[in-house]
């Protein structure tokens, strides 16, 4: 964090005010997933943000945006935009090296707002919110509770299928090949690749339809109502 960096969070009225800078900031954040993109956040807000107050905050102490706080307020509780069902991860967007200045500015801003509880769900275990905001809040006298919410499995895939097979144990490789042979012999299946942007919308509809047919729970989830 720059020792001489000063600044305050600015509240925005729309995603359009910050969309370009938001997209540029993502590549400088510790975590960059689709859930943090302005497109994802905007669609969620437009479709599911009813009865909530948006607190979209930008931190720009110099000429570039170094932090964004995508928050909402409802019944005295401030939390991230989104919800646990549609977001694997949620967090503040903070440029690396600016964590202390951003989180101090965030606490300064929140101290001037009406709220009873700050609930930050779906943080990854290595989130800088846990390593920076939690201790800073405790220093200011806030009661902070950190709980494990859930476990998200993940795997860093190698560059090729052969490399992936090589990473498996001999037993797992044998089992995978056995299942692939069974799939080929007992069912009629095809692998589809969408290579044209013009076909994407139609292919996505087909994909969602297959998801809905695979499980009743998924069908209920994908029902517009």
Where in the sequence are the language-model features?
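A gly/proline- and charged-residue-enriched helix-loop-helix capping module
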Residues: 85-115
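Short, Lys/Arg-enriched N-terminal segments with co-localized hydrophobic residues
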Residues: 1-5
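A conserved beta-strand-loop-helix scaffold within acyl/acetyltransferase catalytic domains
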Residues: 7-83, 123-152, 156-225
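Conserved GNAT acetyl-CoA-binding A-motif
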Residues: 114-123
